[in-house]
Amino acid sequence: MDFAVIVQHGVVYGLVLSVLFTLVLLGAVFVNTEIMMNDYPPEVKKVYGAEKDPKTRGQRRVFSLLFLAVLFGVITWSVVSAARASSTPLTFLPIFVLIFIEVFTFNLWDLLLIDWLIFNTIQPKFIFLPGTEGMPAYKDYVFHFRGFLTGIVFSLVSALVLSGIALIVVNAAG
């Protein structure tokens, strides 16, 4: 398959993944800000303290399952779409590139739009954990950049694993 088509599919489905993940993330924060507390800067978590809402763990599980459903759904959709668009059977490398681009696209989207634009710059009131409003850590761009670097490693590892699974599924359906 032409790698230009793989890259195009990766970017398009990466943007779909990003929009859907953003909706799930915003939904989680609207339901209960504590759901996303693990992703907050350490200074904010220290001032806030332990989770205060007993429902948080259960809600976090629900939203984690939604994240996984979106991830697997979009990746499955993209691999099937790429396989249908290809005149030759997909091999590991194109599937890996496709999935890596999708996950990396979300990682970049998360850094630029969710973390730096919304969390660090716009700072809507609903993102603040009660009692931590105005803390300088809410403007810590470096904290989120480090998370982005970790996300690159996650993108590589998850793309390797998911590509192997996708290749098995594509060949079995073949």
Predicted segment positions?
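Short, strongly hydrophobic alpha-helical membrane anchors
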Residues: 1-8
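Hydrophobic alpha-helical membrane-embedded segments
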Residues: 12-34, 102-119
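Interfacial helix-start motif at the membrane-water boundary
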Residues: 48-70
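Hydrophobic alpha-helical transmembrane segments
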Residues: 63, 140-158
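Interfacial segments of alpha-helical transmembrane regions
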Residues: 87-105
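Juxtamembrane non-transmembrane "cap" segments at the membrane-aqueous interface
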Residues: 113-133
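Short, membrane-exposed interhelical loops at transmembrane-helix boundaries
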Residues: 127-145
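Juxtamembrane boundary at the C-terminal end of a transmembrane helix
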Residues: 162-174
